[in-house]
Structures are given as structure tokens and as C-alpha cells.
Amino acid sequence: TDIFARTSPTHKLRLVTALQARGLTVAMTGDGVNDAPALKRADAGIAMGLKGSEAAKEAAEFVLADDNFASIAAAVREGRTVYDNIKKVISWTLPTNAGEAMTIIVALFAGMALPITAVQILWVNLITAITLGMALAFEPTEENTMRRPPRRRGEPLLTGALGWHIVFVSALFLGGVFGIYTYATDRGYPVELARTMAMNTLVVMEIFHLFFIRNIYGTSLTWDAARGTIVVWATVATVTAAQFIITYLPPLQRVFGTQPVPFLDGVLIVAIGVALFAIIETEKQLRLRIWKRGPE
């Protein structure tokens, strides 16, 4: 740690500029007129709200209302949590939508009957996907959030790792939906039942993917991760109940073109969701291990 005492406004400005020249993101706190140039130059200029001068407040981007430095760390923590939750929503939504699109495209090019009807796709997109996706907006801060280094300046939200995740999970969704649909048709099930199983498989995979995506920087195989939050379990319970209703309630069966799914086939659908979770969690742990070894 380097300490500079009794520095002039010019020295403060040079320190900020020198750190930025090394590619660092610089935060500067100050309360006086002599701090204004450095506050203006810093990436995050923070002026004292109670004891700070008007010049410092005008030059800074942020004003610390309570003059408590602990509030800076709390603000960084909150900002990282919001950013992480936005990234989680995107990481969860895009593979789901891409998997649905790929299912339809592959079926059309192969000249097959659609594994999921248009009404069922609307149900998945407008009801289950939105309901489950909303839970990620209320996710608490992950344990290692404040121990992570800051993001690189200018780093895009859609990174290469996220792009790979979208492609990888979309392919698994495609395989799961087509796999269960092919299984049902090979057993001589009516096409309505095969489509019902395909739709429920898609929703079950969404649920297991939700539990996976809640921890994008660490393992999902912990008690805290499995326990989830009230919001997560409320949305999962709501979606599960809705799926049972449209699958087994006769009036809605006519609307959505569904048929009751036999018990053992329902177990198979859940097993596909478990398999999805196991595969993507294993891939994440391998990727994180390789990433940690990268700088060595």
C-alpha cells in the first residue's frame, strides 16, 4: 500500500491520471475545493455530502450523503448485485428462447410435425418464462461478490462465456424436447400426448436451469443454493401448478391440445431436467477451474 500525505491538487490529479494509465478504474473521495480537479478526472468522483464544499459536490459524480465510507462499499455491493441479476435474467432467457426457436426450425426443415403447437409456445413464453424469469430480478447478493475483481472497462454484457452458455444450453433444450417427443411417438402415443410431454419437458428444463443460473460465479450444489428464496419457490410452485392444470384439467386440455401424462413418463420428464442441471453444472465447474488457472 502506498500512502501520499499533504499532496497538492496537482499531485492528486497526477495520481488519478497515473492509475488510469495503468488500466485501473479509479475512485476518488474528497471534500474541499482542492479535491475538485481529481474528483472530476476520476472514474468515480465521490464528494462528502455533510462536510463537502459545493465545488467538490459539483465536480463529483456521486455525493456521499452520510459521509460514511462504509456506504461506498455498500453501494458497490448493491451495484454488482443489480448487474449480476440483469446478467442472470439474460443468461436464463436467451437459451430458453433459442431452444424453442431451434426446435421449431429443426422440425420445419426436417419435415416433421411440430413438437410444440403455437398455443403451447405462447403459454411457455407469456406465462411460464416470464413468471420464472421475474424471480431472478430479486436474487440476493452472491457470497463472493465483493471478492471478485472489477470488470474490465468496456466489457460487454454479452461476453464470450455467455455466448457459449447460450449455444450449449440451447442445444441441450433442443435435445431434451426432441428426445422426449421422439420417445413418445416411438411408443405409439397420440401426437397430442407427445406434444404435451414435450411442452412439460421444456418447462421442467426451464425450472432446473433457473436453479443453476442463480449462482453464475460459484457452485449451485450447496444448501443455500438449493434452499433458494421465497420468490424462487413461489414462482416455481406457481408454474408447476399451472402446468398440472393445463395438462390434467379437461376444459384447458381442449384449449391447449394437451392430454394427461402417465406417472412414469412424468418421472422421465423430471429426470431430463435433473440431467440438464448435472450437465451444465459440471460444465460450469470445469470452466471456472480453467479460468482460475489461466493467469498462472
Where are the regions a protein language model picked out?
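Short, Lys/Arg-enriched, Gly/Pro-containing loop segments at transmembrane-helix junctions
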Residues: E142-P149, S220-W223, L286-E296
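Alpha-helical transmembrane segments of multi-pass membrane proteins
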Residues: V124-T128, T201-H209, V239-I246, I272-I280
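Residue-level signature of transmembrane alpha-helical entry/exit and packing/kink sites
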Residues: T117, H165-I166, V232, D265-I269
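Membrane-embedded transport module
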Residues: T1-M28, A47-G218
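Cytoplasmic-side transmembrane-helix entry/capping segments in multi-pass membrane proteins
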Residues: T222-I230
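Structural signature of FAD isoalloxazine-binding scaffolds in flavoprotein oxidoreductases
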Residues: A38-K40, K57-E58
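Hydrophobic alpha-helical transmembrane segments in multi-pass integral membrane proteins
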Residues: G176-F178, T238-R254
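Cytosolic catalytic headpiece
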Residues: T1-N34, K40-A44, R80, I86, ...
